[in-house]
A protein has these predicted regions:
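Beta-strand-rich extracellular passenger or scaffold domains
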Residues: 1-238
Length: 238
């Protein structure tokens, strides 16, 4: 399916599922390609199983769920816009400020996903990563919920912002690779939530920036609410 300089809207009703692609056929003719825009609407589910790396346009999940059944199948989303305007580009957006009454979810299951360009999650967005799954980000931020037993990785030299305790609700690790920066933002309520359910952060030569996080209470140390491990990492703003 080729999407040129146009918008393809997938409006899927609640309790309905549309499947595109075949995990056993890399050359499936129903894979996605092009430079346009994909918008997921409706409360139903869109399942993407094909190799969609020829799609370099933008994608917005405004309502319902998008499930990725194949690893690294949307690596290049956003590339066309980011090449022409690198200072103001988006790749994949989960949720929306315009339709904040809806719930939008990106479900990667146990697949391995890398997003070269921005992965942005709004307050009504959900990113689900199951055990064995990993999402590698290079830029962007998430203010919605990140959940599951999988792993979120900030790639080498990347930069990512997590806002609110709900964005740090993984039972798996958040890994910050060499020269990458993970910034956390939140208030006292977020801190209290994190203290009751600490997030594991592994610094593999990366930087954890707490400059925009709330002041830590009383005798609390900077990692109160965080389980920090790894080697060669740096914590700033604590």
């Amino acid at each position: 399916m080729y999407i040129g300089h146009s918008v393809a809207e997938f409006n899927i009703a609640a309790d309905k599922t549309l499947v595109i692609g075949n995990t056993s056929n890399d050359g499936a003719i129903d894979s996605l390609a092009g430079t346009g825009v994909i918008v997921k609407e409706g409360a139903g589910e869109l399942v993407l199983n094909a190799d969609n790396n020829a799609f370099t346009g933008e994608m917005s999940i405004q309502n319902g769920e998008v499930t990725l059944g194949r690893s690294d199948e949307l690596m290049n989303v956003g590339d066309t816009h980011c090449q022409s305007d690198p200072q103001d580009c988006f790749g994949l957006m989960v949720g929306s400020t315009v339709h904040s009454e809806y719930q939008a979810e990106l479900n990667v299951g146990n697949t391995q996903q890398t997003f070269v360009h921005s992965l942005t999650g709004f307050a009504n967005g959900i990113l689900n990563i199951d055990a064995g799954g990993n999402v590698t980000v290079n830029q962007g931020g998430f203010s919605g919920s990140i959940q599951g037993e999988g792993q979120l990785t900030v790639a080498q030299d990347g930069s990512y912002l997590l806002t609110g305790a709900q964005s740090m609700a993984l039972t798996g690790d958040i890994v910050v690779e060499d020269n990458a920066v993970l910034s956390l933002a939140g208030n006292q309520a977020d801190l209290r939530a994190m203290q009751s359910d600490p997030q594991s952060i592994v610094l593999n030569g990366g930087v954890l920036d707490l400059s925009d996080f709330t002041t830590w209470d009383g005798d609390s140390s900077y990692n109160d609410g965080l389980q920090i491990s790894g080697s060669g990492g740096t914590v700033i703003g604590s």
